[in-house]
């Protein structure tokens, strides 16, 4: 009887296969050591494992045919079997590793730094970077005195990770800091943490708990996979004090993520105290300030002030303090804090140094140098997607949309997991009038984030701006289905109702949204939309009341400077309702209150008020300052506004032929989506004013075409209806003119008595009717 086991032993198959497995294991260990030591692609280890296992049948076949003592012939069947195994192995390896980098995990980059020195840097390739969302740790010590560490510990780890280009510790969309206080942050369940991590494009997320021990402090670190929501690793980490614990957690996390050991050993890794402060008295208010940034900027500023009083070398606290002082209308003091941060920038890792210099040049009125610094960062770190995002934001604000689009596309190409960049790409294509590319970007964004409302909101907003209101409504409705408790989809539905002139539906939607408000940011959006609805109806007094509520929230969320700017710009609303004295008083307050670098925007507010009062001379007097302001702020994206105001001054002086090119510049494709945004501070969009000038010049067909464009996108726009009435009257269509006026006056049925546009429409109707 045939004994297969004995035959295997006679042919020495177990010995040969065992030797192959042992040799393969040695090769695998050597490969793993080499990958870690020389920072090679981790895919190389997987490649060796796959090759090792796929060739096992060939080794077994050779052992069976040639393992027995004596000479053996090499058969045709054996050759075919070996060839088939080899072909199969090659095909499997090709399918598994096609497109994967099996070389070095880093690339060398040579650039010239700001001192003119040639610098060579080794930067990780995007494929091997890790994005980690860090959530607050739970205090299980039973000691309330340690509650502040719940938020602080996660933030300290995030700051420490900034030293390693292989790992990006990302925030949590400020959701943790929108309620509670610095010592009692929101502690989300794992399911909610997973959702937030996915929104932030983080492949993994980290949370945990800590407790006090006789020897110091101990934390249980939990690392989860975002896609599956499963626990990947759980570690116990301990240290003598909280900041040392943050260092230990950071190191443990890097190793668990698979950052090559050779890279870890060669990378500077300062203790997190060196990146922050040696003073415990400075650390606690600093972390409190970080927590308060999203909800109470004045409280945050006071916390950072306390931190720098305790340690003036605390560069990161100085940097935040500088930003907040500038936003608090304390420009000179803000620059001093930023300069103090630059003197002690040795406490910052390189990425933060670039951010500091960019902010310093932006605040000090040198926007071009800010862009230069941001561009230098992308040259030093050409594989750093976040650097390209920073550059893209600055370029977009400067008005260089093509360069901004290229920078965003570079960022997405470097890290395809950052799907949120697709919204920015879609917005830029939309503002350029490229509908096909815009929709392609938005739909890809939706495909990658099928569970969230944000992509649906993005597409709905696009269709809203392009006048496709049915499509906009459908996407806002879909967003509501995905997130029923989120007020933003309701805001979108209200906007659609206002665009269509359905004021009652808009009011009902606002009432529904009011019951859903969760955060101060939600409330700000609500009051701004409520103000737009009231302004559309000509209830400017109510609109001003909404603006005051929004301004109070803006002061809380963004600081006094932002609030004072909003308060000053509400002066144009006061002028529109016939209250010139209130408008002047608001401008006087703005002039007396705003400090550099914001004081120069007073000229813009004055011009907007003058436009409402038909004061062409004041507009023209303000124009040089406005154009200089836009250059100084690097705000090329708002250059159209200066053209619009100049065109308005020419129209008021009956110089319409000179105004036409300026109106065309102010209403071209790059700003169309903005113009159809129900920006009621403007009163009427440039296309309507452009049409008015064409009508005066007798170019009725062109005027009609422009007004048709406006009303096809915003059917409920009463200003355009009034201008269309004037056009029809000029063409002898009295009945058509009266019908358009009736539609506008129906919108303004409850307008304030002093509301000037409604009064002018009534006067025109009386004239035509008689």
Language-model regions, residue ranges each:
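Membrane-embedded alpha-helical segments of integral membrane proteins
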Residues: 13-76
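C-terminal/domain-edge helix-coil "capping" segments
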Residues: 67, 92-126, 227-306, 310-311
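Short beta-strand->alpha-helix linker/helix-N-cap micro-motif
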Residues: 111-220, 224-240, 269-275
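TPR alpha-solenoid repeat register
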Residues: 317, 351, 387, 421, ...
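Canonical tetratricopeptide repeat
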Residues: 320, 354-356, 390, 424, ...
């Amino acid at each position: 009887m045939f004994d297969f086991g004995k035959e295997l032993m006679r042919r020495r198959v177990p010995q040969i296969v065992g030797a192959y497995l042992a040799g393969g294991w040695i090769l695998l260990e050597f490969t793993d050591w080499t990958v870690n030591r020389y920072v090679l692609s981790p895919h190389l280890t997987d490649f060796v494992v796959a090759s090792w296992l796929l060739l096992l049948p060939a080794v077994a076949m050779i052992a069976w045919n040639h393992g027995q003592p004596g000479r053996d012939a090499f058969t045709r069947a054996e050759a075919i079997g070996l060839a088939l195994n080899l072909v199969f192995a090659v095909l499997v390896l090709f399918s598994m590793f096609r497109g994967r980098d099996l070389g070095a995990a880093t690339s060398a980059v040579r650039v010239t730094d700001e001192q003119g020195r040639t610098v060579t840097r080794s930067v990780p390739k995007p494929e091997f970077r890790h994005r980690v969302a860090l959530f607050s740790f739970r205090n299980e010590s039973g000691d309330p005195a340690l509650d502040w560490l719940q938020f602080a510990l996660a933030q300290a780890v995030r700051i420490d990770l900034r030293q390693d280009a292989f790992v990006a510790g990302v925030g949590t969309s400020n959701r943790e800091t929108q309620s509670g206080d610095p010592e009692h942050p929101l502690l989300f369940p794992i399911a909610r943490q997973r959702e937030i991590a996915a929104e932030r494009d983080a492949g993994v997320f980290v949370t945990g708990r800590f407790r006090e021990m006789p020897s110091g402090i101990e934390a249980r670190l939990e690392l989860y996979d975002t896609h599956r929501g499963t626990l990947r690793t759980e570690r116990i980490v301990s240290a003598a004090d909280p900041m040392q614990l943050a260092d230990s957690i950071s190191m443990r996390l890097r190793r668990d993520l698979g950052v090559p050991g050779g890279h870890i050993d060669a990378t500077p890794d300062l203790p997190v105290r060196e990146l922050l402060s040696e003073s415990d008295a400075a650390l606690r208010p600093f972390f409190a300030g970080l927590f308060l940034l999203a909800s109470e900027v004045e409280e945050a500023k006071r916390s950072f002030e306390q931190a720098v009083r305790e340690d003036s070398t605390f560069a990161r606290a100085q940097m935040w303090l500088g930003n907040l002082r500038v936003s608090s209308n304390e420009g000179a003091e803000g620059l001093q804090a930023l300069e103090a941060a630059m003197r002690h920038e040795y406490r910052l890792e390189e990425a933060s140094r670039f951010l500091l210099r960019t902010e310093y040049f932006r605040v000090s009125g040198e926007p071009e140098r800010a862009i230069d610094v941001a561009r230098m960062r992308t040259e030093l770190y050409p594989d750093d997607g976040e650097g390209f995002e920073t550059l893209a934001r600055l370029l977009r604000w400067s008005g260089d949309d093509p360069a901004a689009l290229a920078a965003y596309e570079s960022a997405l190409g470097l890290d395809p997991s950052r799907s949120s960049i697709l919204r920015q790409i879609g917005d830029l294509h939309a503002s350029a009038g490229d509908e096909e590319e815009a929709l392609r970007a938005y739909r890809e964004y939706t495909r990658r984030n099928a569970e969230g409302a944000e992509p649906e909101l993005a597409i709905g907003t696009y269709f809203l701006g392009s006048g496709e209101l049915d499509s906009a409504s459908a996407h806002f409705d879909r967003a509501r289905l995905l997130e029923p408790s989120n007020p933003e989809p309701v805001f979108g539905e209200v906007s659609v109702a206002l665009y269509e002139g359905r004021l009652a539906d808009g009011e009902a939607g606002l009432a529904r949204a009011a019951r859903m408000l969760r955060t101060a940011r939600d409330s700000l959006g609500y009051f701004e939309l409520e103000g737009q609805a009231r302004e559309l109806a000509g209830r400017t007094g109510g609109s001003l009341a909404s603006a005051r509520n929004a301004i109070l929230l803006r002061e809380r969320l963004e600081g006094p400077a932002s609030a004072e700017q909003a308060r000053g710009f509400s002066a144009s609303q006061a002028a529109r309702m016939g209250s010139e004295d209130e408008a002047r008083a608001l401008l006087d307050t703005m002039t007396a209150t705003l400090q550099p670098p914001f004081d120069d925007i007073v000229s813009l507010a004055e011009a907007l008020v003058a436009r409402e009062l038909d004061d062409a001379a004041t507009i023209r007097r303000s124009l040089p300052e406005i154009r200089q302001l836009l250059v100084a702020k690097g705000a090329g994206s708002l250059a159209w506004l200066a053209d619009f105001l100049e065109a308005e001054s020419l129209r008021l002086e009956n110089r319409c032929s000179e105004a036409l090119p300026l109106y065309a510049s102010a209403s071209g494709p790059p700003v169309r989506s903005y113009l159809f945004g129900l920006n009621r501070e403007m009163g009427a969009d440039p296309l309507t004013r452009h049409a008015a000038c064409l009508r005066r010049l007798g170019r009725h067909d062109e005027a009609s075409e422009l007004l048709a464009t406006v009303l096809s996108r915003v059917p409920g726009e009463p200003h355009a209806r009034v201008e269309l009435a004037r056009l029809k009257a000029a063409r002898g269509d009295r009945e058509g003119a009266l019908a358009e006026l009736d539609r506008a006056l129906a919108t303004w049925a409850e307008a304030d008595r002093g509301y000037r546009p409604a009064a002018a429409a009534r006067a025109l109707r009386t004239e035509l009717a008689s």
